[in-house]
Amino acid sequence: MPKVSIVLPSFNGERYIRESIESVVNQTFTDWELIIVDDCSTDGTLHIAEEYARKEERIKVIHNQENQKLPEALNIGFRHASGRYLTWTSDDNMYLSRALEEMVRYLDKHKEVPMVCTGMLFMDENMQYMKEFISYNSVQMRVQDTVGACFMYRREVLADVGEYSREFFCVEDYEYWIRILIKYHSIGYLPYNFYLYRRQKNSLTIEKADRIRRMNSLLHCRYFDWCIAGIRDNPEYILFLYNQLLADNWIDEVKRNCFEEIMPALKAEKALDDKKAVVIYGAGQNGERAYECLKEQVLAFVDTNPLKAGGQKCGLPVWTLEELKKYYDNNRHQVLISVRAELQLEIIDSLMEMGIPQYAVFARIS
């Protein structure tokens, strides 16, 4: 019985799957089994997988007669896994040679930890370095997946938290990590890069990006109490979650009351009034997108960047804060904050100090 089971699901992955398989075969740790799940590919994926299985007895191949999509393909693979430790990888990514060895060593040493993840590097299609993945952050996990693609967990985890959810296709891994954190309260982290994550051009279509965004919102709505409990003292993450759920209409009265209790300044965040002119706070890309949505209702922009303030955006003036204070009329105007969530807190505070009683955030119209 192998110590580690690796599941490799693939659908039409013939272009890079050899590199992915070779990265497993070339591991310094050798007590593994690789279970390749061909998810009804129409290219040469199955042929390549079977070629490797004939040469290497540690490799098994499962062929799905119908396409099951990633969550169920993973579940099928793990139902055939016999290892003490479990992991999975993708057909276009690669382990560095010591990845399995180091993760096994960590789990062997830290018996209390259910799972470990490591750093990884983003690469382009030709495996040229692009950038380093953000480090695992247990607090940030409440609003964003920071586990990455190199990880390993104990077989008991599968028994305790169950299989991957088909409902959360596209964010099935993040949802699984949340269940692990709810059950065990921690995930171990090795601050070394043991994985190469290939970012292919045009691989993230508009439709897929939109689904990921919607699934993340649904995920945070489903686990709202857990998410909010871990970020009550972090206003930037509170605003991130608020904006995300607001954009997808997931904020009901209960959630709004919760947000306002934690951050009273959100009581002033209101829907836009069609009868009032809009001043867009933020003359960047989000500000331009806001203008495209509102057009004739927009009076001006506001920005603290000296390179933008005093100029024009979309044919309208870009005010300084002093000009906003001078020209703003509560009866005729309203402010739409159109910057990233992590920049909103300072703006909200400045509006309150200026006596502007309410505002809206861009998520309301995005």
What is the predicted function of each stretch?
Residues 79, 135-226, 232-238:
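Conserved nucleotide-sugar donor-binding catalytic segment
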Residues 86:
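Short aromatic/hydrophobic "clamp" motif used to bind/position activated sugar donors
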Residues 2-5, 33, 175:
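Cell-envelope/extracellular polymer assembly enzymes that use nucleotide-activated donors
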Residues 30, 38-47, 66, 90:
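A conserved acidic beta->alpha catalytic loop
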Residues 64-81:
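Glycine-rich, basic loop-to-helix element that forms the pyrophosphate-binding segment
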